[in-house]
């Protein structure tokens, strides 16, 4: 939304803040690359080039792990989550998927069978209630942040959903933005996994 369309005139009175204090430079770069040159909107009717931003923090480069099958991805995720839980508070770890279907069909049963304490953040569940690692959709994690984020099931069938992939245009760009936002929920580490055919947004 351009602010002047809402009756708010800020031209000549606004400043651009180019420093990211939440996530690392390595995660910021990966997430920005997902946007593939898409310009940002500075809310004043002008375009804002995202490459001008930078983070003060540095850390590990995001990892993208591709697997042949869901079973192989599942084994990796359980190992990775258990490893993270050895040094991190479980509440600071979030497994994120594009859809509720993925979470309910694949990842909730996976964590239950592995005996990993977890909390499913649906639309009615506060993120601060209960212990265990968090599970949420990409939409649900908007506005939240976690030390460690695992973006799971980033496959061609789900990211973007088939109808949106076929439509292209603004809908496809919105999916890029959604993946960008989900990735930048991570403060320290970002791990992206997929199985079968990877999402075209990862290329």
Language-model regions, residue ranges each:
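Conserved helicase motor core of SF1/SF2 NTP-dependent helicases
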Residues: 1-179, 189-198
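A conserved SF2-helicase RecA2
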Residues: 200-203
């Amino acid at each position: 939304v351009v602010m002047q369309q809402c009756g708010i005139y800020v031209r000549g009175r606004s400043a651009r803040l180019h420093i990211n204090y939440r996530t690392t430079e390595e995660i910021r770069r990966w997430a920005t690359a997902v946007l593939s040159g898409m310009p940002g909107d500075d809310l004043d009717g002008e375009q804002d080039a995202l490459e001008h931003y930078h983070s003060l923090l540095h850390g590990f480069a995001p990892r993208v792990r591709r697997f042949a099958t869901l079973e192989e991805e599942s084994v990796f995720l359980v190992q990775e989550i258990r490893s993270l839980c050895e040094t991190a508070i479980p509440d600071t770890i979030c497994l994120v998927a594009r859809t509720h279907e993925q979470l309910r069909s694949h990842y909730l049963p996976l964590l239950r069978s592995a005996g990993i304490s977890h909390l499913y953040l649906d639309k009615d569940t506060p993120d601060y209630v209960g212990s265990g690692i968090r599970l949420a959709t990409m939409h649900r994690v908007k506005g939240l942040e976690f030390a460690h984020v695992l973006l799971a099931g980033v496959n061609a069938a789900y990211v973007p959903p088939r109808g949106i992939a076929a439509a292209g245009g603004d809908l496809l760009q919105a999916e890029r933005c959604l993946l960008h936002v989900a990735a930048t929920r991570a403060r320290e580490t970002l791990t992206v996994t997929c199985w079968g055919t990877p999402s075209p947004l990862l290329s």
